[in-house]
Swiss-Prot record:
InterPro entries: BCAA_transport, Leu-bd, Peripla_BP_I. This is Leu/Ile/Val-binding protein homolog 5. Belongs to the leucine-binding protein family. It comes from the Bacteria. SUPFAM superfamilies: Periplasmic binding protein-like I. Component of an amino-acid transport system. Residues 1-29 form the signal peptide. Keywords: Amino-acid transport, Signal, Transport.
Length: 406
């Protein structure tokens, strides 16, 4: 039998857990609770990584301004220790190890992207320091029976769930669908779930294609899909991949009735990067600032958006809202546990229920929340909510006109 050598980060749990001195990290004399994180601040996905750094900072500052977090009647300030993992998962794992063993942070906030959360959560599990992360949605993260990882993104397998429901009622009818996805943990989970959703809904999957993560050239893939005469294209990828897919679709005059993307569409950057070519693109989000979501620290989602944009000079999207709720989850759990003991805070996280600017937070047995995805579309340069949890909100612009008819 030939064994498969596992990546270094998958072997961490096997290394010396027995005899490990578990840390109950107390606050220092300055009464500070330190949250540690490794985030993509440079490299291919830095544009999304910044949401997490900025969300962590603004939320920590907001909680501190309101008096901090109380433990046994004593107020503690929150602090952030953050590293740039340069979009390198192996570096991220080393940095989380450093945060726990050298920096001795109290608790961990997550990185962006499922492959990072999948790897980095091995560190939180090994050292039994809870991590709350809002950057990874892959079902694989929560399938390992880990006890110290909690996530505020809904399961990737159902990301296109609301979109498939919308497809059922479109006129002209959608029959043939292309499913396109990147070769990484998140996008594979999306594809696996979407494949079943499409089949159960009676759609024909005319193309089912995987591309290499961080691909820049989609011409061959688009040409292949174009030859299938599909009605709709569902793409699971990251923002740069999505931008390149749209640009190259235009250059190849590929104009299905509809295309929808897992990421990018809700962001201001997407609309700025593509200009008028962003129109008609569908996407999804678990959060909109217009939602009626009340919050203990910011007041509501709209106030969070206003403060975030004023401070960082760009609009927050669901990544930022999710990151903010991660910090809030720790504040709630620490106060519920009335302790800084990692095990007690972990147990409190497993049972907390509270309203955040992002939505209601309550973790299931696997450590994940389940918020419905909202279908959005770019219409005349603006982001429009098309379908919410209760059904259609605004009419979609469908079918998408040919590129030469715009």
């Amino acid at each position: 039998m030939i064994g498969t050598r596992l990546p270094a980060w998958t072997r961490v749990l096997a290394c010396g857990v027995a005899g490990l001195s578990l840390m109950t990290i107390s606050a220092k004399a300055e009464d500070v609770i330190t949250l540690g994180a490794s985030v993509q601040l440079s490299g291919p996905v830095a544009n999304t990584g910044r949401y997490y750094q900025d969300a962590y900072n603004i939320t920590i500052d907001k909680i501190n301004a309101a008096g901090g977090v109380k433990v046994d009647g004593k107020p503690y300030k929150l602090a952030l220790k953050i590293y740039d993992n340069q979009s390198n998962v192996n570096l991220s794992v080393r940095q989380y190890t450093q945060l726990v063993t050298t920096d001795k942070v109290n608790f961990l906030l997550g990185p962006f992207a499922s492959n990072f959360a999948l790897a980095d959560s091995v560190i939180s599990e090994k050292y039994r320091i809870p991590m709350v992360q809002g950057g990874g949605a892959s079902d694989e993260i929560y399938s390992r029976n880990f006890k110290y990882i909690f996530g505020t993104l809904a399961p990737a397998s159902n990301y296109f769930g609301s979109t498939v429901e919308m497809l059922k009622g479109l006129d002209p009818k959608v029959t043939n669908v292309a499913l396109v996805y990147a070769d990484d943990s998140f996008d594979i989970s999306v594809a696996d779930g979407t494949r079943k959703l499409l089949k159960d809904a009676g759609f024909t999957i005319a193309a089912d294609e995987k591309f290499a993560t961080n691909s820049t050239d989609f011409t061959s893939l688009i040409s292949q899909i174009k030859s299938k005469n599909v009605d709709a294209v569902l793409v699971a990828g990251h923002e740069t991949e999505v931008l390149n897919f749209v640009r190259q679709s235009k250059s190849l005059a590929f104009d299905p009735k509809l295309y929808s993307f897992t990421v990018g569409v809700p962001t201001e950057d997407f609309r700025k990067a593509l200009g008028k070519d962003a129109n008609y693109a569908f996407g999804m989000t678990a959060w909109l600032p217009s939602a009626d979501l009340k919050d203990r620290w910011f007041g509501d989602a709209a106030k969070f958006e206003t403060e975030y944009k004023a401070r960082f000079n760009y609009e927050p999207d669901y990544h930022a809202a999710s990151g903010a709720s991660d910090v809030e989850a720790f504040a709630e759990a620490i106060e519920k546990a009335n302790s800084l003991d990692p095990q007690k805070v972990r147990d409190a996280l497993a049972s907390i229920k509270f309203d955040s600017l992002y939505g209601p937070i309550a973790f299931d047995k696997q450590g994940q929340i389940n918020l419905p995805q909202i279908v959005v579309q770019v219409q005349d340069g603006k982001l429009v909510e098309i379908r919410g949890p209760a059904g259609q909100v605004n009419p979609p612009q469908y079918p998408m006109p040919a590129w030469n008819a715009r």
